[in-house]
């Protein structure tokens, strides 16, 4: 049976099959352990019956005032397990945690070229809030969409009124 459970330190030794995807942002071990220590409820893994990591989500709570929100830092599912609804399930878990934390919205950044992910997020109720110019390093750098979904605390949905102009990474709060 497939299991969704909290991410553990041991998982860092067996999630390379998921992180090999070129669209998956990867980080150093200290980055993962920092998230695990500070926001464990935002760090979930999907595990196969054989113990293989099928996917994971890593996020955090941040901001203040009406900018208090849940943030998806990384969401990835192994190519072998895509199109099974695992990403949507992981997103729902992060959204539920954000609701419990009394967040106004959940946000994430996605490459503008990642059309499959953008469509999935739109199907989950996310909107393109703004474009962040040259957010992803590369040759050339690539823009990102800052996508958002309002939580129930944002009754008037102010957090998801799209901006009409792009911003630079240093202007992202």
Where are these regions (language model features)?
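Loop/turn elements at beta-strand to alpha-helix junctions within RNA-recognition modules
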Residues: 78, 111-114
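Conserved catalytic-core motifs of GNAT/GCN5-like acyltransferases
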Residues: 107-109, 122, 127-146
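Acetyl-CoA-dependent GNAT
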Residues: 2, 6-82, 91-101, 131, ...
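Conserved GNAT acetyl-CoA-binding A-motif
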Residues: 98-109, 120
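Short acidic/glycine-enriched loop/turn segments that link adjacent beta-strands
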Residues: 39, 66, 114, 138-142
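Short glycine/proline-centered loop/turn elements that form peptide/ligand docking sites
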Residues: 91, 114-117, 134-139
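Conserved G/P- and acidic residue-centered "switch" motifs that form tight phosphate/ATP-binding loops
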Residues: 85-87
């Amino acid at each position: 049976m497939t299991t969704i459970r909290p991410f553990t330190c041991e998982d860092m030794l067996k999630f390379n099959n998921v992180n090999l995807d070129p669209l998956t942002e990867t980080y150093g071990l200290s980055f993962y352990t920092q998230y695990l220590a500070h926001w464990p409820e935002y760090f979930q893994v999907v595990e196969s019956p054989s113990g293989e990591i099928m996917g994971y989500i890593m996020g955090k709570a941040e901001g203040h005032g009406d900018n208090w929100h849940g943030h998806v830092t990384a969401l990835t599912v192994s190519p072998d397990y895509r199109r099974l609804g695992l990403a949507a399930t992981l997103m729902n878990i992060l959204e539920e945690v954000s609701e419990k934390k009394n967040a106004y919205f959940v946000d994430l950044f996605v490459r503008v070229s990642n059309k499959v992910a953008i469509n999935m997020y739109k199907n989950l109720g996310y909107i393109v809030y703004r474009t962040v110019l040259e957010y992803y390093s590369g040759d050339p750098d690539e823009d990102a969409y800052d996508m958002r979904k309002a939580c129930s605390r944002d009754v008037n949905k102010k957090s998801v009124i799209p901006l009409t102009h792009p911003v630079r990474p240093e202007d992202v709060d």
